[in-house]
């Protein structure tokens, strides 16, 4: 120990009591005789020792008394990091003088304090000091194994750095913040959860294992700036971003289906397939399901019972460029017509895919494969290891292509039965602490402590150098009180979007992997791994899953979670959305991971030429719109997949909009110099007498107005010959719509004039409504015109298309508005757009 580094730690003497609750044993911290005290410790690779003759104790031997404070938090808290960007991880230990005892401190606060900086880092209170992690080495915070920390009297130390002490209990507000951890939409604020451990008392740790996916931004900036940063600050490939958003939206649909039915019939499967290429992202709908789930065969397992580091880091095949997402909406999804436009049809499905689907037991994430059908046989001999990378390139043709497939009717029921039957054989699960053999696959029933965003690993060596592999990290725990990270590779990384804090999940065919860089043992997925999300622990009934896992094991896990992680009961339940009840919202009220409708005004558009992703076998550029609802409150809207085709229609010079306005005049041009104008001053009698002049006789096929010869015989429409039928039409009109002080002239075609007049055809104006009545349809039409143009008439909802002709300076030379539809019932459609 004499050759170890010396660590000098200085403590200040605070004048006022700290804003935390401590026991009486630590009262000496509040006031000391001397302003400073000094203690010298010796540091080795594994522990700290007091350099004191009276107490040559290892800090590992310190006892931590029972903590007092919030019963539902048990030492967990979120801290607000100050302006200093501090990285402190699990290997930090809080030291005290030889005259003081370490007391567990539980923090009380009624609310979440304002976040001055979102650069929150993990800070742990441990009783042991493991060697430093790779991240800390990079940060050089503890580069020379020497810490000299001197604090002023008014800055108490919590994690060795300046952390605010305004902490809060884990209630509904905390749950809302924790949702930021597991949502793909929260990319501006990256709070990582502060971790704390008390030994030997119970401990609870909530970690955010995000691997630096998103950049941090202050939250005191405007929402419009945050929306722009959300799109521009992503540090993942556009392919991964595209697939992440599509996956998240489909998981929202699956969650509402699970909550609605809780039945084994799967009508909304989300199937994902990846193939080994960094660019992946194509969306299609298959006509029928031709996929078989056969990932548990012995032939496949015989070739996979080895460490997977080579397979994980030899990920790509240059010939495969796309990843497709397959979705076939069921009847429920068909009601939501807008979402159907995101997907197209495809007859054939590749045999290898990763699927996310709804089954009777929960949301199942699985991988289809044909490894067992391949003639390639691999062994662990040294000769085969030389050519293993080339063999993997041939075998792993489909390791990174993503699909979402929705099966209908009988095929869905049959597929779900196959899923359940496969899980019936997974009765034997292993505790995390018993997963110690690298040559064996394990099935683990665990609880999710912290999901993570998907990040990407750059391949820097080998033939696939320069490519990227998706990776997500999920921290789990089970009744053995062993916490472990689970690495989800390639398409399995997108499973992270299906799990949330407190979910009970079943992981199959995971293996042990030792990270040689940081000396940590983790679980990681294989090509045959599956994930079954049983749901939140508070809503699980063990008897419902007796056919999937051991009921006794599940009960033990639930009992452990209930006793050791009781704070999860305070998390608000996730409310699944209904497909037929998606609401129109204002942008300022947007919530993460919620599907919404919105009426927006396009302010500007941007095509990001460098942000390219694969869609339908082609490279597609990322299109970003700047939109607003209120004046000068801008938000960013990204058009993904087929939505990018809307871009030409959303340019500033033309577009479609709904307006609510009152019709003040209808002008029917008869000749170049003659027109009939109907307005609020027109009497009912004058309108009725004008009806013969606002109709014309035209070709029944094309609507062209037919001229007459000297004998008053209509000439033929030569373009429609031999078709010679005639029909009476309303003349096109020029409508003037007003909204307060603004007015606009709108062109109205003949068909829409007929729709405005309750679909009364122009060729029946002289007909009586009933034989015994003298009231004709012409009288009804005149009364409709009179009511529509009256001063007291109610506003109507008009769907108009605008077309502007601009000069080189974007000055409008010509503007033209055409009526596309007419909605007299403004309550039903609820349009709020203005002129």
From Swiss-Prot:
| Record keywords | Chromosome, DNA damage, DNA repair, Nucleus
Region (Sufficient for interaction with SHLD3 and MAD2L2): which ranges? 1-60
Mediates interaction with SHLD1, as annotated region: 652-822
Reply yes or no: does the keyword Nucleus apply. Answer: yes
Q: Name one Pfam family in it.
A: SHLD2_C
Record GO cellular component, one term: nucleoplasm
Which GO BP terms apply?
Answer: DNA repair; negative regulation of double-strand break repair via homologous recombination; positive regulation of double-strand break repair via nonhomologous end joining; positive regulation of isotype switching; regulation of double-strand break repair via homologous recombination; somatic diversification of immunoglobulins involved in immune response; telomere maintenance in response to DNA damage
Q: Which InterPro entries match?
A: FAM35A (IPR029715), SHLD2_C (IPR031589), SHLD2_OB1 (IPR049507), SHLD2_OB2 (IPR053944)
Q: Does the keyword DNA repair apply?
A: yes
UniProt subcellular location: Nucleus; Chromosome
This protein's assembly is summarised as: Component of the shieldin complex, consisting of SHLD1, SHLD2, SHLD3 and MAD2L2/REV7. Within the complex, SHLD2 forms a scaffold which interacts with a SHLD3-MAD2L2 subcomplex via its N-terminus, and with SHLD1 via its C-terminus. Interacts with TP53BP1. Interacts with RIF1. Interacts with ASTE1.
Miscellaneous notes: In BRCA1-deficient cells, function of the shieldin complex is necessary for sensitivity to camptothecin and the PARP inhibitor olaparib.
Which PANTHER family does the protein's record reference?
SHIELDIN COMPLEX SUBUNIT 2 (PTHR14495:SF2)
Family, similarity comment: Belongs to the SHLD2 family.
Q: Give a short account of what the protein does.
A: Component of the shieldin complex, which plays an important role in repair of DNA double-stranded breaks (DSBs). During G1 and S phase of the cell cycle, the complex functions downstream of TP53BP1 to promote non-homologous end joining (NHEJ) and suppress DNA end resection. Mediates various NHEJ-dependent processes including immunoglobulin class-switch recombination, and fusion of unprotected telomeres.
Q: What is this protein called?
A: Shieldin complex subunit 2
Species the sequence originates in = Homo sapiens
């Amino acid at each position: 120990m004499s050759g170890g580094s010396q660590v000098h730690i200085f403590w200040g003497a605070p004048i006022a009591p700290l804003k935390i609750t401590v026991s009486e044993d630590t009262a000496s911290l509040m006031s000391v005789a001397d302003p400073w005290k000094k203690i010298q410790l010796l540091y080795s690779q594994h522990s700290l020792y007091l350099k004191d003759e009276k107490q040559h104790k290892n800090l590992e031997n310190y006892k931590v008394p029972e903590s007092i404070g919030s019963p539902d938090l048990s030492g967990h808290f979120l801290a607000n990091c100050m302006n200093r960007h501090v990285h402190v991880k699990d290997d930090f230990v809080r030291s005290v003088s030889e005259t003081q005892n370490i007391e567990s401190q539980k923090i009380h606060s009624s609310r979440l304090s304002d976040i001055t900086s979102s650069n929150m880092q993990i800070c742990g209170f441990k009783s042991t000091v493991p060697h430093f992690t790779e991240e800390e080495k990079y940060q050089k915070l503890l580069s020379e194994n020497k810490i000299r920390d001197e604090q002023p009297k008014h800055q108490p130390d919590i994690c060795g750095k300046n952390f605010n002490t305004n902490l809060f209990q884990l209630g509904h507000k905390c749950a809302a913040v924790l949702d930021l951890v597991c949502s793909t939409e929260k990319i501006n604020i990256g709070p990582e959860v502060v971790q704390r451990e008390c030994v030997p008392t119970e401990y609870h740790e909530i970690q955010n294992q995000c691997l630096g996916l998103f950049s941090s931004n202050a939250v005191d900036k405007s929402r419009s700036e945050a929306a722009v940063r959300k799109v521009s600050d992503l540090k993942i490939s556009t392919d991964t971003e595209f697939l992440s958003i599509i996956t998240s939206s489909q998981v929202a649909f699956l969650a509402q289906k699970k909550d609605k039915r809780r039945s084994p019939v799967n009508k909304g499967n989300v199937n994902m397939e990846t193939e080994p290429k960094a660019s992946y992202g194509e969306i299609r709908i298959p006509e029928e399901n031709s996929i078989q789930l056969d990932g548990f065969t012995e032939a496949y397992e015989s070739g996979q019972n080895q460490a997977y580091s080579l397979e994980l880091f030899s990920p790509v095949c240059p010939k495969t460029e796309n990843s497709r997402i397959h979705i076939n909406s069921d009847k429920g999804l068909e009601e939501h017509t807008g979402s159907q436009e995101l997907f197209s049809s495809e007859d054939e499905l590749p045999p290898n895919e990763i699927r996310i689907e709804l089954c009777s037991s929960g949301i199942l994430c699985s991988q289809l494969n044909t490894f067992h059908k391949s003639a390639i046989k691999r062994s662990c001999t040294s000769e085969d290891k030389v050519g293993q990378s080339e063999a993997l390139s041939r075998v792993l043709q489909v390791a990174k292509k993503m699909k979402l497939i929705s099966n209908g009717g009988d095929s869905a029921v049959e597929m779900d039965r196959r899923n359940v039957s496969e899980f019936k054989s997974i009765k034997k699960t292993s505790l995390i602490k018993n997963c110690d053999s690298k040559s064996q696959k394990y099935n683990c029933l665990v609880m999710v402590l912290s999901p993570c965003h998907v990040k990407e690993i750059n391949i820097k060596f080998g033939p696939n150098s320069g490519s990227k592999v998706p990776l997500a990290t999920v921290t789990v725990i089970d009744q053995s009180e062993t916490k472990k990270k689970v690495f989800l590779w390639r398409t399995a990384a997108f499973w992270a979007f299906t799990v949330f804090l407190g979910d009970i999940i079943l992981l199959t065919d995971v293996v042990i992997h030792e990270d040689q860089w940081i000396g940590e043992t983790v679980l990681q997925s294989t090509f045959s791994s599956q994930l079954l999300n049983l749901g939140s622990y508070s809503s699980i009934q063990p008897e419902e899953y007796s056919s999937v896992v051991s009921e006794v094991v599940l009960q033990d896990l639930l009992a452990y979670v209930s006793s050791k992680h009781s704070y999860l009961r305070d998390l608000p339940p996730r409310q699944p959305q209904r497909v037929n009840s998606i609401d129109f919202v204002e942008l300022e009220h947007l919530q993460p991971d919620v599907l919404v409708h919105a009426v927006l005004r396009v302010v500007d558009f941007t095509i990001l030429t460098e942000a390219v992703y694969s869609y339908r076998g082609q490279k597609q550029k990322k299109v970003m719109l700047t939109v607003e609802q209120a004046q000068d409150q801008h938000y960013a809207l990204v058009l993904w997949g087929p939505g990018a085709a809307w871009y030409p229609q959303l340019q500033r010079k033309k577009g479609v909009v709904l307006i609510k306005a009152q019709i003040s005049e209808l002008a029917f041009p008869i000749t170049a110099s003659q027109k009939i104008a109907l307005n609020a001053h027109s009497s009912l009698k004058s309108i009725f007498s004008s009806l013969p002049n606002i109709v014309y006789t035209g070709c029944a096929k094309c609507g062209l107005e037919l001229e007459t010869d000297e004998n008053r015989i209509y000439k033929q429409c030569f373009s429609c010959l031999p078709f010679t039928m005639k029909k009476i039409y309303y003349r096109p009109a020029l409508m003037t719509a007003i909204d307060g002080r603004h007015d606009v002239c709108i062109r109205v075609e003949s068909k829409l004039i007929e729709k405005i007049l309750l679909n009364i055809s122009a060729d029946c104006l002289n007909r009586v409504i009933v034989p015994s009545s003298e009231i004709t349809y012409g009288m009804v039409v005149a009364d409709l015109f009179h009511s529509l143009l009256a001063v007291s008439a109610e506003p109507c909802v008009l769907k108009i298309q605008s077309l502007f002709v601009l000069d080189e300076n974007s000055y409008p030379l010509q503007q033209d508005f055409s009526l596309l539809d007419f909605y007299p019932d403004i309550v039903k459609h609820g349009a709020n757009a203005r002129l």
